């Protein structure tokens, strides 16, 4: 589970390209719809805790259960991790790497408008092996972080709240040019997946 600084920096590069409108190809297809949203990312610092052998973690400040058992969405353990490890959430994006017991790839605890900026609730949890070069293929390209940071910045799923009137500005992800979807899509993209008819 140990993540190198070079993999962290590679993840920051993926985030910067994704939110900067990079139109490079992905699996041979050019992303001509990419938009520069004006967000840039820089690696600031990382606190490394030896979790290469989770059963033998000896860092007293970090309970060994935090890497697996406690690292789950909405749990007391999640709150304990954030409260203990967060660095000034009003100035930094805190990213917590762990191995969630429920198989989650990542999550955010809250959208940006739900708590004051200084609240430790703000931050992103990621399965450590989803970073570029990790073992979670095909989810090891850094795109899970892009997805979760999108939520951190206030973007909803296109299926958020189900399928409503196509012309309802609050439907789906509340972005007018993406149609709301009735359900989540896992796997291959399905164009217009369960969209509401106009």
Label the model's feature ranges.
Residues 17-23, 48-50, 100-103, 130-132, ...:
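Acidic glycine-/aspartate-rich tracts in secreted/extracellular proteins
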Residues 38-40, 90, 120-121, 198:
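Sequence-level motif detector for i,i+2 pairs with an aromatic at +2
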Residues 136-198:
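The catalytic-center signature of Zn2+-dependent metalloproteases
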Residues 15, 43-45, 95, 126, ...:
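Generic structural hydrophobic/aromatic packing signal, biased to beta-strands
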Residues 73-160:
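Active-site-proximal segment of zinc-dependent metalloprotease catalytic domains
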Residues 7, 71, 111, 115, ...:
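Solvent-exposed, flexible loop/coil residues
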Residues 24-35, 77-85, 107-116, 184-195:
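Intrinsically disordered, low-complexity boundary segments flanking structured domains
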Residues 1-89:
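Propeptide-to-catalytic entry region of secreted or membrane-anchored zinc metalloproteases
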């Amino acid at each position: 589970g140990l993540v190198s600084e070079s993999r962290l920096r590679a993840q920051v590069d993926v985030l910067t390209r994704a939110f900067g409108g990079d139109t490079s190809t992905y699996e041979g297809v050019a992303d001509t719809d990419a938009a520069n949203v004006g967000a840039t990312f820089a690696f600031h610092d990382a606190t490394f805790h030896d979790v290469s052998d989770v059963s033998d973690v000896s860092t007293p400040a970090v309970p060994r259960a935090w890497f697996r058992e406690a690292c789950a969405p909405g749990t007391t353990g999640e709150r304990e991790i954030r409260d203990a490890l967060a660095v000034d959430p009003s100035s930094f994006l805190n990213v917590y790497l762990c191995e969630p017991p429920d198989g989650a790839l990542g999550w955010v605890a809250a959208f940006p408008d739900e708590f004051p900026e200084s609240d430790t609730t703000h931050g992103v949890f990621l399965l450590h092996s989803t970073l570029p070069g990790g073992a979670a293929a095909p989810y090891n390209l850094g795109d899970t972080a892009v997805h979760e940071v999108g939520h951190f910045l206030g973007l909803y799923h296109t299926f958020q709240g189900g399928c409503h009137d196509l012309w309802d500005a609050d439907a789906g992800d509340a972005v007018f040019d993406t149609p709301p979807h009735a359900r989540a899509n896992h796997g291959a993209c399905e164009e217009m997946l369960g969209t509401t008819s106009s």
